[in-house]
Amino acid sequence: MFTINILLLVIPILLAVAFLTLVERKVLGYMQLRKGPNIVGPYGLLQPIADAIKLFTKEPLQPSTSSTTMFIIAPILALTLALTMWIPLPMPHPLINMNLGVLFMLAMSSLAVYSILWSGWASNSKYALIGALRAVAQTISYEVTLAIILLSVLLMNGSFTLSTLITTQEHLWLIFPSWPLAMMWFISTLAETNRAPFDLAEGESELVSGFNVEYAAGPFALFFMAEYANIIMMNAFTTILFLGAFHNPHMPELYTINFTTKTLLLTTSFLWIRASYPRFRYDQLMHLLWKNFLPLTLALCMWHVSLPITTSSIPPQT
């Protein structure tokens, strides 16, 4: 039974990832006043399937100087972690209702750094290594602010359990009392998922494709799927944290519809940002985080800690 549950979670995610690639190409196309994919199937709807068949039937080439084991493990690890992070997300019922769901999410996103590092290092190519080092520095840096923002939100929530966030936001979305945190969180998730304008790891003009430059066919497709699964997951997480979906215990379907709509809107905004903004310079990226976001998030975290104490109230206990 548990296997069926896992499959019922994983298969829709992989389908969503497949069609997100199509949506992205369509959105970028229309924003640049062209059509986007429209040959394969009606309105180009079969394009992702054609892409998948093409990628997985090609020969997976491998550089002769690369270290084989790591080269193969890295993409598998990337996709596995991307799918694992969906486990504690309440939609409205999570696959496993963890007491420390938020901590689990943080731990998994930190582990994702290893797949990037291994892929860059195992490729034995200087471009892949530079791309991997950039990606690792960026991901690790932005995780600092993500963790502090999460801490501030959890002080309002009262526990590390993600399901209680639904109850916390029954009357008021957390984006209203903590909108600066929400804005910084959104920008940090852009950086965390290596999306434009923070896609320095895959700067085409200087690094060809970044850490996955030596990958072809199947393994490359795994990296690609991991990236898009992470994008949808981060937006779902943002929805749960700040845009608490409407929850009526008698009609859980309404929650799911509400939740999916908000997640889709956020994902579309990711694509919109990609079409609108140029890439940051590397020093600007780091400056934004260490000089702007970190002091602000720390100050707001102290505010969230001290306010309940000052007003002699206690944070919600669960």
From Swiss-Prot:
Keyword NAD (UniProt): yes
Complexes and interactors: Core subunit of respiratory chain NADH dehydrogenase (Complex I) which is composed of 45 different subunits.
Enzyme Commission number(s): 7.1.1.2
Subcellular location(s) per record: Mitochondrion inner membrane
Family annotation (InterPro entries): NADH_UbQ_OxRdtase_su1/FPO (IPR001694), NADH_UbQ_OxRdtase_su1_CS (IPR018086)
TM region positions: 2-22, 70-90, 100-120, 146-166, 171-191, 222-242, 254-276, 294-314
A Gene Ontology biological process term: mitochondrial respiratory chain complex I assembly
Gene: MT-ND1
Protein keywords: Electron transport, Membrane, Mitochondrion, Mitochondrion inner membrane, NAD, Respiratory chain, Translocase, Transmembrane, Transmembrane helix, Transport, Ubiquinone
Chief location: mitochondrion
Name of the protein this chain belongs to: NADH-ubiquinone oxidoreductase chain 1
GO function terms (MF aspect): NADH dehydrogenase (ubiquinone) activity
Reactions catalysed, as given in the entry: a ubiquinone + NADH + 5 H(+)(in) = a ubiquinol + NAD(+) + 4 H(+)(out)
Lineage: superkingdom: Eukaryota
